[in-house]
Structure formats: structure tokens, C-alpha cells
Swiss-Prot record:
Gene name of the record: apt
Taxonomy of the source species: Bacteria, Bacillati, Bacillota, Clostridia, Eubacteriales
Protein name, UniProt field: Adenine phosphoribosyltransferase
Predominant cellular place of this UniProt entry's protein: cytoplasm
SUPFAM superfamilies: PRTase-like
Compartments, record wording: Cytoplasm
GO molecular function: adenine binding; adenine phosphoribosyltransferase activity; AMP binding
Family note: Belongs to the purine/pyrimidine phosphoribosyltransferase family.
Amino acid sequence: MNLKEHIRVIENFPKEGISFKDVTTILQDGKVLNYTIDKLAENLKDKKIDKIVGPEARGFLFGTPLAYKLGVGFVPVRKKGKLPYETISCKYDLEYGQDELQIHKDSIKKGDKVAIVDDLLATGGTIASVVKLVEELGGEVVNVSFVIELTDLKGKDKLEGYDINSLVQYNI
């Protein structure tokens, strides 16, 4: 299956000059969603993963079914103030300003082998923050997987030294 054929591209969204890659078309088609999760799982089958971690919000959409498929737990990473228990935080830069991500303190145990999953790799700032959170809790990031990678934005540069997979690549 050519997954790229199932990703809707919307030009000039959310603002002029942006070519938005819409993954909701993957989610709407059961066969395409199953294929996507199977391909993500294939990349992890020999990694002995303990947990899947996914950032808000679209990381939840692919991370949770992937965790189910692999028979492991899923850990959400959310924006500040959205998790109910004790958390640790990591700030990261946005185009204009900063944002902050949080993870529950008890969600990753020392030595847990963790795969991080998200829908899209752009500049890498969000995922670099997720990596920091996992490692601060003592987890070992053994893989970082994406459905889509925007190669021209060089997000992999912020993740140097980590095993990275993406199912579809776009040059923007």
C-alpha cells in the first residue's frame, strides 16, 4: 500500500504558505489505519518495548493502537496542566514563544525500554522534549517513530543518536 496516497494535503492551512498533511484520512479508513499500525509495529518487533509514549494529541491516535498491538502500556505526554497526578515538565520553543509538556512521574520506570510515536516529524522540538522527559524518568528511548516526516525541516538533527523511523517522507 502506498500510504502517501491516503494522506490528504491541504495547501495554505493553517496559514498561507503551509502545506498541511492531514492524517485524519488514515484514521477514517480501517484498512489504512491497520496497515499504518502494522508498519509501525514491524519497526519495533525486535526492540523489546515496555512502553509506548505519545505526545498530545495526534501521538495518542497512533500510539494507543500501537501499544495495544504490541501488548504494552501507553503513556500520554500532555501540555501543562492537563495531567491530574504529579508530573515533570519540559519547555520547548515554538515559532513565537514557548510551550511546556508534562508526563506523570510514575509512568516510566528506570530501565523501561520506550518507543516514542507521533504523527509527524517537522523541526523535532516537540519530540526532543518528549525524549528529555522519558530519560529524566530513567527510561531508555530505543526508537522514535513517525507516520510522516518533513525531511526539509531537518527534525532528525535534534534526535541525533536515536533510532528514527518514518513511514512517509515529504520534501516541502
